[in-house]
Amino acid sequence: MNTKFFKYIIPALSLVFSVNFTSCLGDLDVTPIDPNLNVEFDQNANFAKIYAGLAITGNKGPDGQGDIADTDEGASGLMRMLFNLNELPTDEAICAWSGDVDVYPLNFAKFTASNGVVLNMFNRLYIQIAQCNNFLIQTEGKDDEESLTQRAEVRFIRALDYYYLIDLYGNVPFVDENTGIGTYVPERITRANLYTYIEKELKEIEPQMKAPRANVYGRADQAAVWMLLSRLYLNAEVYTGTPQWSAAAEYAKKVMDAGFSLAPNYGDNFLADNNTSPEMILPICYDGVQTRSWSGLSLSPALSVVT
């Protein structure tokens, strides 16, 4: 055996591997060179995404780069699913197309865990809650006026998401900005405890919100907080076993006293310029150019009546 070979080749190989591994590690530890890549938290962009999540389904317009994978993106928007889950089981609306295996059963109040509408609404709400939690984590400690207002509005959107969860699903998993990050199954919260949480959140943020009609159109204000509290109290007996009729009436009156009223013509609420309607407390804004989705409710009551 040629011992000289091992004497010289092994140290040489060791040096080669050492250099290669060092070089490899160095290549992975570099600063991004793409000038369009922002590794810092963009507060305004994330704030806009939270509101946009009420209307759009992804990052590319009406379709493409959807928030929820492996589904019909157009059917995964909040308003479309909320309408289907709330209206189709009642005698107020019907979807007569029996070919839709997810929507058609809702006409008969048939809810299953495998139903696409039931599943995707659950996913949509928790995606939004996760985005709200991240925003609150990233802006913790910021005390400028705009940040405080944005944080209050984000907490409102999260409370709204949890309101839909308590109303549609009951006892659900609970996560907030204080929940640890990692792979685990979140603990479920009872309907009664989630009711208490939503009520507490709304009352805490109320003084931090803009006055009614004083905020940018499409953003929540104190009237939105009062309306959500009124709706929460309206079903308090279902959620907690204790009715809260007087509280529901109290907060509804606060909304009416703030200048909101029914539109003289109900159909005007469905026009493109419905931003002038006195009914609009918290609109979900769509735009044919900038904010497009297959999940909006551009339905004319006059064209949707079965005769």
What are the residue ranges of the model-derived segments?
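Structural recognition of the beta-strand scaffold that forms the well-ordered cores
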Residues: 136, 165, 173-175, 280-283
